[in-house]
Amino acid sequence: GAGEVLCYDGMTGRYFKSSVEAIKKAQNEINHSLMHSGPESLSAFYGLIGLPATSMSDELGWNSNELMDITFSTTMSPEGEPCIAIDFARAPIPHYFRTY
C-alpha cells in the first residue's frame, strides 16, 4: 500500500511492510471491538496488519479491562535498513477472554 515502510514486531521478531497510520487504524479497530463486542486476540490484530497468526498469538489478547496500546520506536533491520518497531505498552495477556 501507499506509504508502506519496513516495520518490526517486537513481540514475535517479525518484519513486515506497513505504515504508522495502518497500524494505528488496526489498534483503533481492536479497541473499538474491546469496548463494544468483547475480548480480542493478538492474532486478530496481526490479521489487520497483514501478519499471519502464530500459536502464541492465538493464546494472548486483551479484554475490556485493558485497552491495546501500541508504542512506536525505530530500529535497524539486520540488513541495516531503518524500520518502525512496534511493541505494546500493555502486553497481551493469556486467558484474556476472562474478565474477572
Can you name each region flagged by the protein language model?
Residues 1-100:
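Long, helix-rich, hydrophobic modules that act as membrane-proximal anchors or helical bundle/coiled-coil regulators
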